[in-house]
Amino acid sequence: MATIAQLIRKPRKKKKVKSKSPALHYNLNLLNKKVTNVYSPLKRGVCTRVGTMTPKKPNSALRKYAKVRLTNGFEVLTYIPGEGHNLQEHSVTLLRGGRVKDLPGVRYHIVRGTLDTVGVEKRRQQRSAYGAKKPKAKS
C-alpha cells in the first residue's frame, strides 16, 4: 500500500481502455495527409481478398471472410455473415465492428445489403441484420 506522501509525489495512473475495433477510430485526410482520431460506427472499404477460413479448436466449418482496405488506409479481416455472398476482389463494402469469437484476427463484420454487397436471399427472420427485403405477401 502506498503512503500519502508517495501518492502526492506520483499519483495513481488511470487504466487506458483499449479499443476492440481500432480501425474505426481513425480518419485519414488525404488533402493535408493527417490522421485524425475520430470514431465512426461504419467504414467503407475495398475487398482485396475473399476466401474461407477454418475456426478454432472445438468448432469445424468454412467461415467466409474478406480482407478489406479501408478509406483510412487500414487493412483488416472482416467476416461475411449469412448464407451465400456475391463479394469478389475490388467489391466496395461497408463494415462495422464486432468480432467473430472462433476466427483469430477477425474483428469486423461486413454490413449486408449495402454498396456492392447484396442481402441474404429468402431470409424470413432477422431480415434487417442481413439486408433482406420484405417478402411479397401471397394473395
Swiss-Prot record:
Keywords: Ribonucleoprotein, Ribosomal protein, RNA-binding, rRNA-binding, tRNA-binding. SUPFAM superfamilies: Nucleic acid-binding proteins (SSF50249). Signal peptide: none annotated. It comes from the Bacteria. Transmembrane segments: none annotated. It holds the Pfam family Ribosom_S12_S23. GO terms for molecular function: rRNA binding; structural constituent of ribosome; tRNA binding. GO terms for biological process: translation. GO terms for cellular component: small ribosomal subunit. Belongs to the universal ribosomal protein uS12 family. With S4 and S5 plays an important role in translational accuracy. Part of the 30S ribosomal subunit. Contacts proteins S8 and S17. May interact with IF1 in the 30S initiation complex. This is Small ribosomal subunit protein uS12.
